[in-house]
Amino acid sequence: MPLHKSAEKRLRQSEKRNARNRARKKELKVLVKTMQKLIEASAAKPEVETAYRSVVQKLDRLGVKRYIHANKASRKKSQITRDFNTYMQSAQQ
C-alpha cells in the first residue's frame, strides 16, 4: 500500500494504463488469430485480405505508440506477411 498521496495516484494511473495496454494487446491477438483461422479454413480472398490489412495496421499503430516494441511489431508483421503470401499463392493455383 502506498503511504503518500502521490504514490496512491501513481498506483491508480498505473492500473489504468496496465488495463489499457492489456486491452490493446488482446485486440491484436484476436485479430491475428482471426486471420490465421481464415487462412486455415481457406476462406475467400477478400476476407483474408481485409483481416491482413487490419492486423498490419494494428501492429504499426501499436509499434509507433510503443505498446509493443517496434522490433516485435516488425517481426510479427513479417511472419504474418509470409503466411498471407503463402496463402495467396496457394489460392491462385
UniProtKB/Swiss-Prot annotation:
UniProt-annotated stretches for the region Disordered: 1-25
Reported function: Binds directly to 16S ribosomal RNA.
Any one of the GO CC terms: cytosol
Protein name, per record: Small ribosomal subunit protein bS20
NCBIfam families, alphabetized: S20
Record field: transmembrane: none
Compositional bias annotation for Basic and acidic residues: 1-18
Molecular function via GO: small ribosomal subunit rRNA binding; structural constituent of ribosome
Species per Swiss-Prot/TrEMBL record: Chlorobium chlorochromatii (strain CaD3)
Leader sequence segment: none
Keyword annotations of the record: Ribonucleoprotein, Ribosomal protein, RNA-binding, rRNA-binding
